[in-house]
């Protein structure tokens, strides 16, 4: 990858937590559980910062040992945490991930409700800081519970009104919480404020709409792009006029936890560097493939590591 001149600033609002990973992929050589920082939004913040993007994080954690773990890692990654709030009366959430022999994963959340990440609200200072960016990224994991749901929708709306790029990862987790009509309406409201919508093609995007990939473009406004992740098939970029396909990189995955966040990281990074949709999809796939070769959602590359990865796999 050639040296890129990055000038865009990205604000990320949403979830941060810790991940406890139980890896059962090799049952003959079981490993001890591993603790990582996690959270869909925080993962993207970490990945973008490692790639040289100026990143600020907006969210809340418990004032506990796990919250300190997350804060320390964000500081080490160079993320601005001026708008990260530590709460006395709520616990930092833990996502317990079980990795199967196929590298597929299953998640369990503790506490199941009222985690600290769901309590974030904006004040006058954070609203002002929120608009100090070129790009806002959010995740649908924050649409399930109040007050962070209302906070996220407000943030998306005001950034959209100020012509900021707003990217929204659907992150429905319908296998955990279902997909009620009222929640679907909330998701569609968030989509209406979005410039870019990320999601798994079959498990999320087609679930929200009519299940027909051929008519998906009819749901996309003139100023929107849908980025459809499709596992080993790669990814699609769809506008109301065009469709671009980027093939996945053939590798043997070790751990798929956080692969979608890694893809989003690569796509946003490339877009901030001025790449077109095709090259941004390609770089999204490269960062996702790099992540798949390591454990935990934070196995994410610097620019130098990504260059080395691309040379190894002979990616131009």
Where is each model-derived feature located?
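Glycine-rich phosphate/adenosyl-contacting loop at the front of the ribokinase-like
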Residues: 1-79, 252-254
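Conserved phosphate-binding/catalytic region of the ribokinase-like
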Residues: 1-11, 157, 209-316
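Active-site metal-binding loops of divalent metal-dependent hydrolases
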Residues: 16, 40, 141, 170, ...
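Short, conserved phosphate/pyrophosphate- and ester-handling motifs at nucleotide-, phospho-/glycolipid
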Residues: 48, 200, 260
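Anion (oxyanion) recognition and catalysis
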Residues: 49, 75, 157-161, 191, ...
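Conserved N-terminal subdomain of the carbohydrate kinase-like
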Residues: 54-138, 307-316
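Hydrophobic beta-strand scaffold residues
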Residues: 55, 81, 166-168, 226
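Conserved phosphate/ATP/ADP-binding segment of small-molecule kinases
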Residues: 162, 172-244
């Amino acid at each position: 990858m050639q040296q890129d001149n990055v000038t865009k600033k990205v604000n990320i609002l949403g979830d941060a937590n810790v991940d406890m990973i139980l890896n059962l992929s090799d049952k003959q050589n079981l490993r001890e559980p591993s603790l990582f920082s996690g959270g869909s939004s925080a993962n993207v913040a970490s990945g973008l910062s490692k790639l040289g993007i100026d990143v600020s994080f907006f969210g809340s954690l418990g004032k506990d040992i796990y919250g300190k773990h997350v804060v320390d890692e964000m500081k080490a990654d160079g993320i601005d945490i001026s708008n990260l709030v530590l709460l006395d009366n709520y616990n930092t959430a833990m996502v317990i991930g079980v990795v199967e022999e196929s590298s597929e994963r299953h998640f369990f959340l503790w506490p199941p409700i009222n985690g600290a990440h769901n309590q974030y609200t904006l004040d006058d200072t954070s609203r002002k800081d929120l608009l100090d960016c070129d790009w806002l990224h959010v995740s649908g994991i924050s649409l399930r519970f109040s007050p962070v749901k209302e906070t996220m929708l407000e943030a998306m709306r005001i950034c959209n009104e100020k012509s900021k790029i707003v990217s929204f990862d659907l992150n429905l987790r319908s296998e955990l919480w279902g997909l009620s009509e009222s929640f679907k309406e909330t998701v569609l409201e968030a989509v209406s404020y979005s410039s870019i919508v990320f999601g798994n093609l079959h498990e999320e995007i087609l679930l929200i709409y009519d299940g027909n990939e051929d008519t998906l473009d009819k749901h996309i406004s003139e100023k929107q792009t849908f980025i459809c992740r499709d596992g080993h098939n790669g990814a699609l970029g769809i506008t109301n006029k065009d469709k671009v396909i980027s093939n996945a990189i053939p590798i043997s995955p070790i751990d798929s936890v956080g692969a979608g966040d890694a893809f989003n990281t690569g796509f946003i990074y490339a877009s901030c560097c001025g790449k077109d949709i095709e090259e941004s999809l390609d770089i999204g796939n490269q960062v996702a493939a790099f992540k798949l070769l390591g454990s935990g959602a934070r196995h994410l590359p610097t620019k130098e590591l990504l260059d080395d990865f691309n040379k190894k796999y002979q990616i131009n």
